[in-house]
Curated annotation (Swiss-Prot):
This is Serine protease inhibitor Kazal-type 11. It comes from Mus musculus. It is found in: Secreted. GO terms for cellular component: extracellular region. The record marks 49-50 as: Reactive bond. Residues 32-87 form the Kazal-like domain. Transmembrane segments: none annotated. Disulfide bonds join 38-69, 47-66, 55-85. Probable serine protease inhibitor. Keywords: Disulfide bond, Glycoprotein, Protease inhibitor, Secreted, Serine protease inhibitor, Signal. Its main location: secreted.
Length: 88
């Protein structure tokens, strides 16, 4: 490969990379993850320690889908999206 071709690919990468990063950052969270399947979780022992935040309609962020589902057993909350809740 010639050095001109390598320079072209490098510059093209620098130009296009911010576009793809911005696209993924503004994608709606609902399109990235589905509503948690709460039938899988019945007790805290079912929950992993993996941080995958879930935002509920009460504006509370839950550690992951399992903790969201356990709270849903005792409170009338609904899933909003995967991620940390933000002020609206």
């Amino acid at each position: 490969m010639s050095s001109t071709w390598i320079k072209f690919l490098f510059i093209l990468t620098l130009v296009l990379l911010p576009y793809f990063v911005a696209e993924s950052a503004v994608a709606s969270p609902e399109s990235l993850r589905k509503v948690p399947n709460c039938t899988l979780y019945k007790s805290e022992s079912d929950c992993s320690r993996t941080l995958i935040p879930v935002c509920a309609d009460n504006q509370m962020t839950y550690y992951n889908a399992c903790y969201f589902c356990l709270e849903q057993l005792v409170s009338p909350i609904k899933y909003k999206y995967h991620g940390i809740c933000t002020k609206e």
